[in-house]
């Protein structure tokens, strides 16, 4: 899954705006270097000051796929999106556009397909008899769409993006409301698979464990949903089977030791099957701090949100997934923010996916190459004109942020510099960090 470009006719502050996701000036050697680090995954980070339109672009992208089958009037502008997907060992070049209320798809440059809109009340697709284009159903072209779109966003911009419980149609969007994740105190069916995959990976991958620097307990609490039974693996539904792996039992919850299960590949596959089919779900997991086991509701807001986001992604990510993630650094300390891109790379480099991220965080920016970053300013969207990968923070701030003409504290020091005596200047010198102002004070004391 690789997005090449997005054209927006008129939406929010954008009018006749084309956004290119790939620089045409990247050298072959740089491309090869990036592939060593990022593998098959693609990533684009949108950065810029508040109000430059980062969220507008990402939420618009989500709305394209949310309303492609039904409610097309809710796609707020005509558009054209160009991407490629790989399925069944073939690569397909796709152009999807909306023009004059028509949705048209081009597959390998065949522009003869108009996607009919589905009318749920009539239970059928509605043919556009005024059109000369070949009419196809959403089901006909679903193969050429992303397998799913994961959205980790905020309520206002993504209002209505999730599906109602009785929605009839394809559910292409998986939505995680960022505000609500800060309040979650327990796991559930929709993250259980992600928790299991995550704990399995951290159990065996030393690099992953080193990057994350969190000690996870091998124990989880599981809950049995008897009403969800089906024929396959029936012998593994019963709590009697899991008794030999149980550490503690409280009511309908059992604490089990995952290390024993991870060492038995067949048993691990069966547990994964039961979780995928919502027969068992993980109700609680633990990290270890100061030799104590900490439950979800005892974790900090940042720990809880960060882990939940990773579990959500791991539970839902597939080949040809688009992941839209708004400000992933929210509530993270600098160390975790710095490790986020390497962590995603370790998790996803073998998958053909595309991450779309909005962020102001310098340690995310310098984890990426300049052709993976789009800098939004008042009237332009372009790649940074300097190399961002592993550059220092000051270089990023001076090149990406607008220059601040006035700073109250700096003005105060400059005034003191001009009127203070030697002893006062020495006090200033000892209380200011390394900077150009400190250099000026030092010069004054000479």
What residue ranges belong to the model's regions?
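Switch/communication elements of ASCE P-loop NTPase nucleotide-binding domains
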Residues: 1-71, 82, 86, 278-413
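Long, low-complexity, polar/charged, intrinsically disordered or flexibly structured peripheral segments
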Residues: 228-299
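P-loop NTPase switch/coupling surface
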Residues: 1-250, 378, 410-446
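Low-complexity, intrinsically disordered regions enriched in charged/polar residues
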Residues: 143, 189, 252-255, 261-269, ...
